């Protein structure tokens, strides 16, 4: 069968790589993709991701059997709806169901209604009310802008001054807009991907841990993710089971009960508190860079899992008996302003590197985004995989990239 992947980043690179391995898949297309994907897929950078009509026309022309949507924006914009209306099979939720990521308030309200464990929250609609609220709120407080923010719309404020600054950032010159304040939760964070079809929820039996902050020791601003690893040895199978029972199954049932037909992967960003696992966020797609490490460890056929889910079967994932560590190299300045067009070399176009922000300029690759390339390390345990990942990092040549030196350290410190 012919499969079309939508997206241009490292997550989509990993999806294309994994789908290309499937005996069920004859051809993988990627729109818009990036040139690093050309060994495994037919890449069409000339078609832009927001051009839904061009994507539809391409899918018709190439007799595409399945479309796999990687990023959140096309889901929120209703690409899945348009494709389904024209008879295509799509892995990714429709516009209505994608609100679970598109609106933090939508997600909080549905969790509140169905008693799904999450932090207490307060919504405000005006800047002046936000400034009033923080005068007496408990610190630290988590400040979230409603809507999509590429993983960067969350600020943890430890002081009133930091909270005021967060509000200024969220509102800018506007006086109105929805901001959600949340009680700060303490504990170990983890990411659980769950395949969902209506009220059928099939969680991965392997979790990953992301590293959101830009710099070592979890310092600096939030990013889209500076690295990840799996499995997470200090999060037990019992916690995974509890997360499934108290979060994954209830949210699938809640969404269907509210009239939202979710089909795709639901990302559960959770935290293990002293009171058990609680939801930090939901995403309507694979995490990035979690997808890269999880799909590298997945032994079973991703395409078969998607078909099983479509047929309402409780698919069984199989995993390699190894650990995976992924370290992200990003443009200096990210997640704030950064330069583009800097040469990057030293890496191979294979499963050891997944590219997020590079483009071809002549025969060389140059930076084109904030997060640039993820180096994948493999090993019998986390320590060996971490060593292998940083060896792969050291092979990359560029004067304009930075990376964290402590990806997966938590797993080693908590042994």
Swiss-Prot record:
Q: Signal peptide location in the record?
A: none
Catalytic function, reaction form: 5-phospho-beta-D-ribosylamine + glycine + ATP = N(1)-(5-phospho-beta-D-ribosyl)glycinamide + ADP + phosphate + H(+)
| Domain of life, per lineage | Bacteria
The record's section on InterPro entries has: ATP-grasp (IPR011761), ATP_grasp_subdomain_1 (IPR013815), PreATP-grasp_dom_sf (IPR016185), PRibGlycinamid_synth_ATP-grasp (IPR020561), PRibGlycinamide_synth (IPR000115), PRibGlycinamide_synth_C-dom (IPR020560), PRibGlycinamide_synth_C_sf (IPR037123), PRibGlycinamide_synth_CS (IPR020559)
Cofactor comment: Binds 1 Mg(2+) or Mn(2+) ion per subunit.
**Binding residues for ATP:** 134-191
Which terms does the UniProt entry file under GO BP?
A: 'de novo' IMP biosynthetic process; purine nucleobase biosynthetic process
* Catalytic EC class: ligase
Q: Which residues form the ATP-grasp domain?
A: 108-311
Which residues are noted in the entry as Mg(2+)-binding? 281, 283
The keyword Nucleotide-binding is annotated on this UniProt entry: yes
Quote the Pfam families the UniProt record gives.
Answer: GARS_A (PF01071), GARS_C (PF02843), GARS_N (PF02844)
UniProt lists the family membership as follows: Belongs to the GARS family.
PANTHER family in the record = PHOSPHORIBOSYLAMINE--GLYCINE LIGASE, PHOSPHORIBOSYLAMINE--GLYCINE LIGASE, CHLOROPLASTIC
Q: What is this protein called?
A: Phosphoribosylamine--glycine ligase
């Amino acid at each position: 069968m012919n499969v079309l992947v939508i997206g241009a980043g490292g997550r989509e690179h990993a999806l294309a790589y994994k789908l290309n391995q499937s005996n069920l898949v004859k051809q993988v297309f990627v729109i818009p993709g990036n040139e690093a994907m050309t060994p495994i897929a037919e890449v069409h950078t000339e078609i832009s991701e927001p051009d839904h009509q061009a994507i539809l026309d391409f899918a018709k022309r190439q007799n595409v059997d399945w479309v796999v949507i990687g990023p959140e924006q096309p889901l929120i914009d209703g690409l899945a709806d348009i494709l389904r209306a024209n008879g295509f099979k799509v892995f990714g939720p429709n516009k209505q169901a994608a609100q679970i990521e598109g609106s933090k308030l939508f997600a909080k309200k549905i969790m509140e209604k169905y008693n799904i464990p999450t932090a207490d929250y307060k919504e405000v609609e005006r800047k002046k009310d936000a400034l009033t609220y923080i005068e007496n709120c408990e610190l630290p407080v988590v400040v979230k802008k409603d809507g999509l923010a590429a993983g960067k719309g969350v600020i943890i404020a430890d002081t009133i001054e930091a909270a005021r600054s967060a509000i200024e950032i969220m509102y800018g010159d506007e006086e109105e807009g929805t901001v959600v304040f949340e009680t700060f939760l303490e504990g170990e964070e983890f990411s659980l991907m769950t395949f969902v079809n209506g009220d059928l929820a099939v969680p991965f039996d392997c979790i990953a841990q992301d590293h959101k902050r830009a710099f070592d020791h979890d310092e600096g601003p939030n990013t889209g993710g500076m690295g990840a690893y799996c499995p997470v040895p200090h999060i037990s199978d019992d916690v995974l089971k509890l997360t499934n029972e108290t979060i994954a199954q209830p949210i699938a049932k809640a969404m269907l009960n509210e009239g939202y037909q979710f089909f795709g992967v639901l990302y559960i960003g959770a935290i293990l508190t002293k009171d058990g696992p609680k939801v930090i966020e939901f995403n309507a797609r694979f995490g990035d860079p979690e997808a890269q490490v999880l799909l590298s460890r997945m032994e079973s056929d991703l395409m078969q899992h998607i078909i099983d889910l479509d047929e309402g079967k409780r698919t069984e994932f199989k995993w390699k008996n190894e650990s995976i560590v992924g370290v992200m190299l990003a443009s200096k300045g990210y997640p704030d302003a950064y330069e583009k067009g800097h040469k990057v070399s030293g890496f191979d176009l294979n499963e050891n590197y997944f590219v997020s922000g590079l483009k071809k300029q002549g025969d060389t690759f140059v930076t084109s985004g904030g997060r640039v390339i993820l180096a994948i390390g493999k090993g019998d345990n986390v320590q060996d995989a971490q060593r292998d990942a940083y060896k792969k990092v050291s092979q990359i040549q560029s004067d304009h990239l930075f990376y964290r030196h402590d990806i997966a350290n938590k797993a080693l410190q908590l042994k």
